[in-house]
């Protein structure tokens, strides 16, 4: 088997040229078309970009086949891609563009009117289509392609300073992850994969590349569908899905529909979950409704290429433990539980920080050497990452014990609570604030903002909340905006003068 991701995907253009690699709402892209178009785009980039190949290419859009073409074309030109979804606020896009310092900004959809990209070439959607037409039939030099330890993609995650961090994932990282998924999860040729997560969220890698590498079909549910529950419930059975990849929260939403079951989705026999805690209640109900299905619970940070552990969730597993295990580490990785202060490796049964070592671990954050050195390190010749997650090993399984800092997972999105607080403090009506996660069924249900407001003229608190949210929407993604607002005149403080978060947490999670 060749190790190049591109060679393996392109091979399907010969084996099954007319089979769809992407299909949704009447839009269909075959493997032959994917190869021809990505070849054309790779040729265009090689002829028109003279900048350093270390500089990535930003691809802006939303779950369209053109994004796949742009991703693979970028790789064929020797450059990593940075996916940026249309749902991101303008300020966030500007932050990513500044941090990534890209060689080109590619638009598969129109940019917002209030966003102007400067400092690098911008390729509009029309220009992209024109490039595909003009370079049709050209094949880029294979030697130019991303390979080995070259960056393959860079995904930006929430950062504690309010600025996103770019996680560099190499070709080798992605090969390691993809081979593990295809083998351990028994994913055969020609399956239809649900694509629920936007490409800017690393959960999408769990469906995108296993699908393309196995000659399968990617079936996206874009934001217009997922925003309307009636449309969502109608579309899912119509797509004849084989493999379900999502956050547990998305599955919970679908379980509200009594028709979400095996009878209406006869081909759906694999569920892969990542991004947040899978509750026992969710897993149990899925097993009831889908008796032919296998459910996998997985765990991993963006810094270790999506996921590094897995467990097949059975009735026996559900009954045996108070919470579901995250599973066992993939074969080419090691997992240590360490004392956060001393770094000493702890024995099974003791709680500590999860440290990941091996083939899936990123080289670090793009253009951020200091932040990289804080959490990445060399362990006996292997790349290692301090996750900041607390865990414990029992019966050989990893169990999640929460975050060691203020970072949480909400509906699959990794969020730094400090990031939200720093952004809230930009709002004119907020003097000080603290963000508290409200827990339900072993996971974060929503974010609660405790706020000391500035002087204002609003008569009702809901009017103040509306004004705050209006300002926030200008520079913060919707998923980071708190759902509940509590207003205070002051905060309880600890002995050293810091906000007493334990006290605030006990108020929210009574």
Swiss-Prot record:
GO molecular function, a single term: D-alanine [D-alanyl carrier protein] ligase activity
Keyword Lipid metabolism among record annotations: no
Highest taxon, organism lineage: Bacteria
Positions bound to ATP: 157-158, 297-302, 389, 498
GO biological process: lipoteichoic acid biosynthetic process
GO cellular component, one term: cytoplasm
Record Gene3D superfamilies: 3.30.300.30, N-terminal domain of ligase-like
The reaction(s) this protein catalyses: holo-[D-alanyl-carrier protein] + D-alanine + ATP = D-alanyl-[D-alanyl-carrier protein] + AMP + diphosphate
Residues holding D-alanine: 202, 306, 498
Pathway(s) where this gene product acts: Cell wall biogenesis; lipoteichoic acid biosynthesis
Keyword vocabulary terms for this entry: ATP-binding, Cytoplasm, Ligase, Nucleotide-binding, Virulence
EC identifiers of the protein: 6.2.1.54
Pfam family, one: AMP-binding_C
InterPro entries: AA_adenyl_dom (IPR010071), AMP-bd_C (IPR025110), AMP-bd_C_sf (IPR045851), AMP-binding_CS (IPR020845), AMP-dep_synth/lig_dom (IPR000873), ANL_N_sf (IPR042099), DltA (IPR010072), DltA-like (IPR044507)
Main location (coarse class): cytoplasm
Cystine crosslinks: none
Cell compartments where the protein resides: Cytoplasm
Family: Belongs to the ATP-dependent AMP-binding enzyme family. DltA subfamily.
Function: Catalyzes the first step in the D-alanylation of lipoteichoic acid (LTA), the activation of D-alanine and its transfer onto the D-alanyl carrier protein (Dcp) DltC. In an ATP-dependent two-step reaction, forms a high energy D-alanyl-AMP intermediate, followed by transfer of the D-alanyl residue as a thiol ester to the phosphopantheinyl prosthetic group of the Dcp. D-alanylation of LTA plays an important role in modulating the properties of the cell wall in Gram-positive bacteria, influencing the net charge of the cell wall.
Record-linked PANTHER family: ENZYME, PUTATIVE (JCVI)-RELATED, PTHR45398
This protein's name: D-alanine--D-alanyl carrier protein ligase
Source species of the chain: Listeria monocytogenes serovar 1/2a (strain ATCC BAA-679 / EGD-e)
């Amino acid at each position: 088997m060749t190790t190049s991701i591109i060679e393996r995907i392109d091979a399907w253009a010969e084996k099954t040229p007319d089979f769809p690699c992407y299909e949704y709402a009447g839009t269909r892209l075959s493997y032959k078309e994917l190869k021809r178009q990505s070849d054309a785009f790779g040729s265009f980039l090689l002829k028109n970009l003279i900048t350093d190949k270390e500089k990535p290419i930003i691809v802006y859009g939303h779950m369209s086949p053109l994004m796949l073409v742009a991703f693979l074309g970028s790789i064929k030109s020797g450059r990593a891609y940075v996916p940026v979804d249309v749902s991101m606020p303008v300020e966030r896009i500007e932050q990513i563009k500044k941090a990534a310092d890209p060689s080109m900004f590619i638009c598969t959809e129109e940019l917002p009117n209030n966003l102007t990209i400067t400092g690098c070439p911008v390729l509009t959607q029309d220009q992209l289509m024109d490039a595909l037409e003009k370079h049709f039939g050209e094949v880029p030099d294979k030697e130019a392609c991303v390979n080995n330890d070259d960056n393959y993609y860079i995904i930006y995650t929430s950062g504690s300073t309010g600025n996103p961090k770019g996680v560099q994932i190499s070709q080798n990282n992605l090969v390691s992850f993809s081979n593990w998924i295809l083998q351990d999860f028994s994913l055969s040729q020609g399956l239809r994969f649900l694509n629920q997560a936007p490409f800017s969220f690393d959960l999408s890698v769990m469906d995108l590349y296993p699908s393309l590498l196995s000659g399968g079909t990617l079936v996206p549910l874009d934001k217009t569908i997922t925003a309307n529950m009636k449309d969502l419930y109608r579309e899912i059975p119509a797509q004849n899905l084989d493999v379900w990849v999502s956050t547990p929260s998305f599955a919970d939403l679908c379980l509200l529909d009594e028709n979400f079951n095996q009878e209406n989705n006869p081909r759906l026999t694999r569920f892969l979950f990542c991004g947040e805690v899978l509750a026992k209640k969710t897993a149990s109900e899925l097993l009831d409704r889908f008796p032919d299905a296998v459910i996998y619970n997985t765990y991993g940070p963006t810094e270790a290429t999506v996921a590094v552990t897995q467990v097949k969730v059975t009735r026996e597993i559900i009954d045996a433990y108070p919470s579901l295990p995250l599973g066992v580490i993939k074969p080419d990785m090691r997992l240590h539980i360490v004392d956060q202060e001393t770094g000493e490796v702890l024995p099974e049964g003791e709680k500590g920080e999860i440290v990941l070592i091996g083939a899936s671990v990123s080289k670090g954050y793009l253009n951020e050497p200091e932040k990289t050195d804080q959490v990445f390190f060399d362990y006996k010749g292997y790349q290692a990452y301090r996750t900041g997650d607390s865990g414990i090993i029992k019966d050989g399984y990893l169990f999640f014990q929460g975050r060691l800092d203020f970072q949480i997972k909400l509906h699959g999105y990794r969020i730094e609570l400090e990031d939200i607080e720093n952004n809230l403090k930009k709002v004119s009506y907020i003097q000080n604030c603290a963000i508290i996660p409200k827990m339900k069924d072993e996971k974060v249900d929503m974010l609660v903002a405790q706020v000391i407001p500035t002087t204002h003229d609003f008569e009702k608190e809901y009017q103040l909340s509306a004004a705050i949210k209006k300002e926030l929407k200008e520079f913060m993604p919707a998923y980071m905006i708190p759902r509940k607002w509590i207003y205070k005149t002051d905060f309880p403080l600890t002995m050293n003068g810091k906000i007493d978060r334990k006290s605030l947490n006990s108020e929210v999670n009574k």
